[in-house]
Amino acid sequence: MNVRVRHFMQSLDSRYQHKTVEEECNAAWDEHKIYKWKGNVAQSFVIDTPPPTVSGVLHMGHVFSYCHTDFIARYQRMAGKDVFYPIGFDDNGLPTERLVEKIKKLRAVQLERAEFTKMCREVSHEFRTKFRNLFRRLGISYDWALEYHTVSEEVQRLSQASFLDLYAKDKLYRKQQPILWDTVDCTAIAHAEVEELDLHSHLNTISFHTVGGEKIDIATTRPELIPACVALFFNPEDDRYTHLHGQFAVVPVGGHKVKILPDDKVRIDKGTGLVMCCTFGDETDVYWWRTHNLDTKTIVSRTGHIVDLAEDTPDAKIPAAQFDGMHVQKARKAVCDALEGAGLLVSQEPIVHTVKCAERSGAPIEILLSHQWFVRVMEHKHELLEQVQKVQWHPDSMRKRMEIWIENLNWDWCISRQRYFGVPFPVWYSKREGEVGKVLLPDVRDLPVDPLRDLPSGYGRDEVEPDVDVMDTWATSSISPQFLTKSVGQVLRNENLEPLFPTDLRAQSHEIIRSWAFYTMLKSYYHNGEIPWQNIMISGWCLAEDKTKMSKSKGNAMDPESTLDLYGADSVRYWAAKSRLGADTVFSEEVLKTGRRLTTKLWNASKFVATFFLRDNPPAGTTAAPTDLWILSKLHKAVAHNTENLKLFEYCAALNRTEEFFWKDFCDNYLELVKHRAYNHGSAHGHASAVSTLHHTLKTLLLLFAPFLPYVTEAVYGTLFSGCIHAQEWPNADEIPYNASLEQHGDALIKIVEEVRKAKTHAQVSVKYPVELITIGGLATDFPESMLEDLKHMCCAEQIKLTAPDSTELEVAVTLAPTVSSN
């Protein structure tokens, strides 16, 4: 494809100006649609790209992982694949709502639903534009014609079709049962949205008594839940309490009576060994409640306040009614104060313990009884673990994280959220006599629907109750492979795009293995009966200088725009590529500076090499000089190494090998060894061989660097060679000469050069200072004559002497020319 960057048509500027180059390249790429998917399904390489959440500005941590995917996309494109590389924006759900609330300095509950969702759409549009501009500056090679966003009508149609398909297959259900509740955002959440935080608290030892009057002590961190106590438990192996089996205890706050029961989940060595079960303090309470068929006493509201307290009995040591309406945090202290006043607070020990909190708001989780929609998980854990084994994980160690997550799951996936801006459930509930509560669904051809606005076929407004909840944002983004194919199981079909499933690659960071990766595997298994992608590539975190995860909420995130202004996109991409796949990396300006030095060196080396040939017209002649065959042998191995590693998504290893070849083999040594022949100071044959090799090696080097440094390589290639570099074929190692013997001789030659350089450095003389004699002994004494001639010119040596091999090691002696006295 004959695409050139106009600014550099004639020659390379004296300095690399990254801002000018980036603008020119983007304009040319857009004009010629370099990254457009051509529609060749059979030759496609399909990437399931993570849609960034519209929850605030992107930072260097996002840049880090999105660059990793682009390295692979660019390689696959050059390797002959028709790359299907979309970008989406996840702009529905709680993260976007929280952003709007922060920007507008209000809460969603203060506005009418329609007004707030309109505000959300406006803000998400603004941030999608910002995201788009940043990705373009980074040189991410998306096909922008494939762009989607999750609150669009098209994606809502697919998401609601997913719901209908799962409902038809009995893979989801609606039920009242215990759920995790965020009291700040006032919504149900899933286990994947929970983080564990170490918080300061107190372990309170509190006196209960049996109906018979025996004093018994329990230990708890949540005394405010005592009015919700429904049983006391002890371990059946604990001899201290076995006599209590079947007795009743009187709860001090409120005075109601509860059974004392054995259960082996109680730890004998924790607290007093006697535990109260409340509905609900934690997931163990839920287990006991279900297993022992206990009563339900729900006293925590959706906003985290104490409510619905039962009437106090005459046995109450402390009236519960006084705590009604208090927030749980305030009630915790108030209950302890009351217990202490009544002589029932035995002890209070300060502790730091792990508390499950909502990932977004940071609020400690409450467990409430509520009607919600759930996707079945528990009964299919074995099949899901089998699906995990079918995917190729890069690195493979990340597979274990998914396995552990699935093995430890105890609940089905709650997908309903009590929020406003999201994909609505396509559900109404009948109010007709004889079918009250019946679930009513639309025809798939009518999607998307909004139950608050639309009606099911054959029903009037007064005959239905719309489902007012919205879906978990993961319930939508988990069908990202289906976004690409416009198909969901058998419900929605697109025969032209269906062959793109399963996709070739999912790229994402490791913290969302438990959410995005897991939910996508779950949905694809239910919809399609197979894995969603052949490969999954997992990036690590970008860490701040204090080695904590870089994040907007922590205030330690670096601004990518200013970094791009200062260092340029290629330097930023270089920094991103220097971290091994799956490994965390600390943000480093030193690495950015190294990347900037690399782009400058590549620019300058290209200018130097270009002085020896006309663009795309190297001199005729066969590369035959031994030194030239040495560098081509090194190049052959670099190309083979990089091809193999990029096939395995090991971008870091590929860049490192290219960089090492460029700096050490090409710039530091080969250019110096070949300079005299390139300047035509030797034979015509030697000159032709040198210039042809320089031409071929530089061209191949640019191709090897292109996935990582797309701008500088485009500018150089578009000036010195023909066409757009990103539309060229990836180099083939088999087409580059390899000679093992000459590679060995060349490597030995470089060791000799290093000894000469050391001698000159030690003598504190110039690299151009003349050498009287280089004596070479050991095994490597059968150098081709022309190699020694190249060595002589490079080292400014008058004579090179080869001695008989009397050692298994290379031996080098350097005699510098005598210093000329100024007298």
From Swiss-Prot:
A motif ('KMSKS' region) lies at residues 549-553. It is found in: Cytoplasm. GO terms for molecular function: aminoacyl-tRNA deacylase activity; ATP binding; valine-tRNA ligase activity. Its EC number is 6.1.1.9. A motif ('HIGH' region) lies at residues 52-62. GO terms for biological process: valyl-tRNA aminoacylation. It catalyses: tRNA(Val) + L-valine + ATP = L-valyl-tRNA(Val) + AMP + diphosphate. GO terms for cellular component: cytosol. Pfam families: Anticodon_1 (PF08264), tRNA-synt_1 (PF00133). Its main location: cytoplasm. InterPro entries: aa-tRNA-synth_I_CS (IPR001412), aa-tRNA-synth_Ia (IPR002300), Anticodon_Ia_Val (IPR033705), M/V/L/I-tRNA-synth_anticd-bd (IPR013155), Rossmann-like_a/b/a_fold (IPR014729), tRNAsynth_Ia_anticodon-bd (IPR009080), Val/Leu/Ile-tRNA-synth_edit (IPR009008), Valine-tRNA_ligase_type_2 (IPR022874). Keywords: Aminoacyl-tRNA synthetase, ATP-binding, Cytoplasm, Ligase, Nucleotide-binding, Protein biosynthesis. ATP binds at residue 552. HAMAP family: Val_tRNA_synth_type2. NCBIfam families: PRK13208.1, valS. ValRS has two distinct active sites: one for aminoacylation and one for editing. The misactivated threonine is translocated from the active site to the editing site. Catalyzes the attachment of valine to tRNA(Val). As ValRS can inadvertently accommodate and process structurally similar amino acids such as threonine, to avoid such errors, it has a 'posttransfer' editing activity that hydrolyzes mischarged Thr-tRNA(Val) in a tRNA-dependent manner. Belongs to the class-I aminoacyl-tRNA synthetase family. ValS type 2 subfamily. Monomer. This is Valine--tRNA ligase. It comes from Anaplasma marginale (strain St. Maries).
